[in-house]
Amino acid sequence: SLQQADGGFAVAYGKHDGEPLFTDLKDLRPTFYGFVVAYKLLGEHKYLDAAVRGADWFVRNAVDKGAFTGVCGDARFINDFATGQAVQALLDMHGLTGEARYRDAALRTARMYATSIYTHPTPGDREIEYKGRKMQEWQISQVGLCFEHGGCAGSAVKSGPILLTSHCGMFVRLYEETADRLFLDLARAAATAREAHLAPDTHMATYYWSQFDRGPGPFPHHAWWQLGWIADYVFAEAEMRSGRRISFPRGFMTPKVGPQRIFGFEPGTVYGEQANPIMVKGLFDADNTDIEILSALTTDRNRLCLILMNSTPRKLHATLTVHPAAIPGRRIDTASAADPATGRKITPGDDGAFGITLPGYGIQTLKLDLEP
């Protein structure tokens, strides 16, 4: 095993001889998480034992000292989003073992990582011109964004923060765990109103804030990471806002990029019914892009669940039209919908559309029956 007797690892190993590299550095990263994955997949207790040794070493050497290294060898492993991964890795260790020390270490690490999230300058709504385009100041805000790597030599110095904000879903979960509003506010600041940084041709977000709307350049695989963190975030919001009456089990963290955890490996629950998330083209039309709409299908294929969430602090209204034939092999009964949170029956207007009004950061779930 590459794990050392004390539970730690070398930062890197030679490809051909297996000898440790970068021996002037310590591996202050959650490398032990690989054993968490192995234990969950294989069930052999030796992997859990190794994860415990590694996590305990990490807490002593990284968390207790407030010192972390990153994953980017081209920047001498300076601290980066691996610190965010450490939070989730320690939370997973708490879930596996029930040991309170891992939860405590996770929350301490989370508060340290929060200091690397941008909170300044505070944007306003004054009109500015940036790279030849007129816009309001908040449209290119840095608030809520994380950096690729920090310090005096990291990319944050030259390129600013990044738009790949993989911490958002985790920060929502940390708010649930701690009731510390800062986590939720930073997650929402990072996730919303980022259209100015989308590439006009691909609608993919630019990686570095400084590159504005140029897109990901030679890294198109960033699109997968964007899908991952966005999905993790919006479903985390749904889970939190519903008081966990909506819940979807997550898989493992994405390698390198951050603490996002994706779902889809097994069904979740939507107000007492097992369901799987779905994305069906042409399922519905809605007229307010500030309201997020998630969709799920119960495992018995008898109900469609639509989860509507207001992404702003203001009361909003949306008109929602559901298309009856959008799901192959089923017909959606659009004559009425049930609100499982209240037990109310909701009927559409004369035009067949549902009128939905949501308070600031509100949520409403609709369940529609499906027929063969």
Stretches found by the model and what they are:
Residues 172, 272-327:
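Carbohydrate-binding surface patches
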Residues 2-20, 59-77, 117-153, 198-217:
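Glycine- and aromatic-rich loop/turn segments at beta-sheet edges
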Residues 1-10, 45-68, 104-124, 184-204, ...:
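Long, well-ordered core segments of solenoidal/helical folds
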Residues 224-284:
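Catalytic cores of secreted or luminal carbohydrate-active enzymes
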Residues 323-342:
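Solvent-exposed beta-hairpin/edge-strand motifs
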Residues 19, 23-26, 43, 74, ...:
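Structural signature of alpha-solenoid helical repeat scaffolds
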Residues 229, 349-372:
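C-terminal beta-strand-rich structural cap/linker in extracellular carbohydrate-active enzymes
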Residues 30-45, 85-99, 154-155, 163-180, ...:
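Well-ordered alpha-helical scaffold segments within catalytic/enzyme domains
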